[in-house]
Curated annotation (Swiss-Prot):
It comes from Cyanidioschyzon merolae (strain NIES-3377 / 10D) (Unicellular red alga). Residues 6-63 form the HTH lysR-type domain. This is Probable RuBisCO transcriptional regulator. Gene3D superfamilies: 3.40.190.290, Winged helix-like DNA-binding domain superfamily/Winged helix DNA-binding domain (1.10.10.10). Keywords: Chloroplast, DNA-binding, Plastid, Transcription, Transcription regulation.
Amino acid sequence: MTDLPFTLDQLRIFQAIVVEGSFQKAAQSLYISQPAVSLQIQNLEQQLNAPLFDRSHRKAKLTEAGQVFFKYASRILALCEETCRALEDLHHLQAGSLIIGASQTIGTYLMPGLIGLFRQKYPHICVQLQVHSTRRIAWSVAKGHIDVAVIGGAIPTELIPLLSIQPFAEDELTLIVPPDHPFARLSKIQKEDLYRLRFVSLDRHSTIRKVIDQILHQNGIDTNRLKMEMELNSIEAIKNAVQWGLGAAFVSVCAIAKELELNLVREVEIEAISIKRQLYQITNPNRYQSKAAFTFCQQMLNV
């Protein structure tokens, strides 16, 4: 058998450079020195007798040969990973790993409980939870870096043909106010009362903010008239702001169980308005699904 002109380590280094965008970042992600990365790529290019990167650009840009090589290198590494996963399954979930992805609110408040239930049954499975934006999580599933994910935002159009997308649950969003707010004593308010409130909210580009604005608009609420006093970048910051009387907010019900129990905030119902968003379980149908991933998916759908 003819010796191959590359090693798996060289493929991993090459892939890391493409994914990270530079030799330096690739070295950092692999915990090796940049000179070691450069040397491996030089040796690889010599063995292949083809330049893989255009050195005239600051960012690592692939040559035509590099683009072809990246396509096959990714497939080789994916097959190696799938081989290891398939062998792990022979242990009947007594070993192995599971990488789960989730968008911000879901990963922070919903997934820990689901993972806890799974770990009670399968304590020997190493579970990793990655929490990022919906777009980044969807791309990671498509690339095979995440086994299964739960998201609540719009999936990039170009990824839809590459993913298996299954409705998982509905996430209810509710209005909360400080416990001493006049509305806290009311069982229900009218939608016109929203114009009297001062709001703290996530950034207007966030998934939850878009869902809320869309549903309010559908119910005749002019979101441009709502008094947005402050934009924050996390649900925890929003909850704290409401507790300190800085305004009202729309948040996921799953994020405020403790605050409601301790009477730190009050939930206020809006007449004839229900704000919900669909959550989806996504996987990559073109990638080998480990027994751990399959079992976790089934558990989620049966909770």
